[in-house]
Amino acid sequence: MLRYSNLFNPGSNYIYGNAETYGKDREYDIVTCMFAFHEIPKEGHRRILNNSIRISKNKVIIVDISTDYKPSKMMLAGEPYTLEYISNIDKLMEDFSFEKRNLIKGHVDIWTYNKAN
């Protein structure tokens, strides 16, 4: 993903790291986490959100599967945290004051946190 980001946006700086601990305070303009939360145990979500807000100057964007997504049995066999994610993520994002928008009905949601400068 980063390789393609640099291809389409030369001169921009994209970095990846441990989402729970990476970065210095207010080090990045925008922090994103793409299609990861449904792969992570519930306990990690809060740590990731706290850290993302800490290292962001302006905005945090979380993109993941929609909470109205209906996973198949085959998907659930390899995605042990998906049902827990679907059941709990909206409340957690609300607790952190993220705004939710459905990007693709039944498939993709996006949550945005805007920091006051």
Predicted regions and their residues:
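Hydrophobic adenine-recognition pocket in adenosine-nucleotide-binding enzymes
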Residues: 36
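A short, conserved alpha-helix within the catalytic core of class I
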Residues: 40-51, 55
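A conserved beta-strand element that flanks and buttresses the S-adenosyl-L-methionine
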Residues: 32
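Class I SAM-dependent methyltransferase SAM/SAH-binding core
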Residues: 1-22
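Core SAM-dependent methyltransferase catalytic element
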Residues: 97-117
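Conserved beta-strand signature within the Rossmann-like core of class I S-adenosyl-L-methionine
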Residues: 56-67
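Conserved Class I S-adenosyl-L-methionine
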Residues: 73-95
